[in-house]
């Protein structure tokens, strides 16, 4: 059964519509990621006033960006420090691009789960903002927990940052990052389809894809020297590297949705049906 589901998912990923949706998600994800990080760093710098939280975010970025992490971190921090109006611009851009991320995903999910109708434009806007806010809260909670863990370890170890401190903080950060990823996948699969989807039917897929996404990131970073983007794209290699990883992430999101739709027979409920389940092939 597992082999059958896996082959079914792989066949779906070879379809042109899957690649179209993934590229659309990738483009808007890149456009929304940096405004989101600017807002997050601004909150840390100007509301929480926490250097520990900033260090945690920097480590998050080093773990999740495939290349030129220090350059990106410095650029984001300089934006927050030097431009006061950038926060409002970031909010506006984030509102626009978050819709661009979730709109193609909703259409793709509705096809995967067999829901006939998509939401209206305003309905999708509302759900997109809700999901963007929820993902932002998840990220902020992860940062706060990681910073609290680092602060507690410093107290326990009397301020000494030795190898034990480094290993424990790194392990905690990776666990929190993976948990945050799982939470985001779960929210996408549960809320975004235009129909009632049972939480238990998408949770296993969200857990699997959250873990696979973290592993895939390391595999992608390992493969970068062989891809050799700088030789082909020159000064645009950073953007291409991020875009390619965003595209792969988009395909992984769609793969998880395909697996979730098959995980529990009759997992989805149409809006018109309160108690009847439909079987999705």
Segments from the language model and where they lie:
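Membrane-embedded alpha-helices and immediately adjacent juxtamembrane helical segments
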Residues: 1-281
């Amino acid at each position: 059964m597992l082999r059958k589901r896996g082959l079914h998912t792989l066949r779906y990923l070879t379809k042109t519509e899957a690649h179209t949706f993934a590229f659309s998600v990738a483009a808007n994800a890149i456009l929304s990621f940096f405004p989101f990080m600017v807002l997050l760093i601004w909150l840390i710098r100007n509301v929480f006033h926490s250097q520990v939280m900033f260090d945690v975010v920097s480590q998050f970025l080093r773990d999740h960006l495939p290349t030129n992490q220090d350059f990106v971190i410095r650029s984001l921090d300089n934006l927050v420090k030097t431009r006061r109006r950038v926060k409002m611009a970031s909010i506006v851009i984030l509102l626009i691009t978050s819709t661009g991320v979730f709109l193609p995903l909703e259409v793709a999910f509705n096809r995967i789960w067999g829901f006939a109708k998509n939401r209206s434009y305003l309905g999708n806007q509302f759900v997109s903002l809700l999901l963007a806010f929820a993902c932002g809260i998840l990220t902020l909670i992860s940062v706060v927990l990681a910073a609290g863990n680092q602060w507690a370890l410093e107290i326990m170890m009397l301020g000494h940052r030795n190898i034990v401190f480094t290993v424990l903080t790194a392990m905690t950060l990776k666990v929190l990052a993976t948990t945050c990823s799982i939470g985001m996948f779960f929210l996408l699969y549960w809320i975004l389809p235009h129909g009632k989807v049972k939480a238990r039917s998408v949770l296993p897929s969200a857990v699997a894809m959250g873990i696979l996404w973290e592993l895939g990131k390391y595999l992608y970073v390992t493969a970068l020297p062989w891809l050799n983007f700088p030789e082909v794209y020159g000064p645009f290699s950073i953007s291409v590297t991020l875009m390619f990883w965003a595209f792969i992430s988009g395909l992984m999101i769609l793969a998880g949705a395909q697996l979730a739709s098959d995980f529990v027979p009759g997992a989805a409920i149409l809006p018109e049906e309160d108690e009847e389940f439909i079987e999705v092939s």
